Amino acid sequence: TLLYLMSGLLTPRNGRVTFYDTDVRRRLPVTLQDMFLVPEEFELPSISLVSYIELNSPFYPHFSKEDMMKYLHFFEMDLSTDLGALSMGQKKKVFMSFALATNTSLLLMDEPTNGLDIPGKSQFRKFIASGMSDERTIVISTHQVRDIDRILDHVLIMDNSRVLLDEPVGNICSKFLFVESDDRELTKTAIYTLPSVQGNFLMLPNTENEETEINLELLFGATLAEPEKIIQMFHPKTIEQ
């Protein structure tokens, strides 16, 4: 729903969504040519990929055929593809490649790893990383947090329309440690735990300024279970007020 509001496909009951100071509800060409939405479910016409590109790329001034070929290569595909002969997972790879090749400044992706097999998910991470730049914002909505935790630089966690967490990954990792341990004493100090084969995954206060990779599953569980405690770690005054 949030992504559809951001793209102007849904209209908010209150307030408005702006993109470069323009209300997205107006659906102006100058707005539409600079954003792209990859929905969770979609259909592609039974035509060749070359024809699809010829029909749709003119709507996006910054589309690059060279980029399209590069992104397809990540998924071991090429331009000589008949869209009607593809599986759902293959169609998603083609559509995401086209989306990234449009070079819009805003790319919205809803559950992009759904329908991808294990090799496809690994390819997806490399694919997204290759398309990142300072000129582009990529917003990914997902419940498959393990598929994307290593490519994010900012995390937004929402629950029933309430924003519980909105922080850069660097800030999060400076506040918390994410480790796996069977140490019972260490487990007692954890903010949040999840069972693992070797004991527990632990989310701990980062009191020694150590560096660990973010565990989104732990962070998500902790934020939903104790939102006030997590908010206080970043914004103490919010709780005091």
Where do the model's predicted regions map?
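ABC-family P-loop ATPase nucleotide-binding domains
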Residues: 37-94
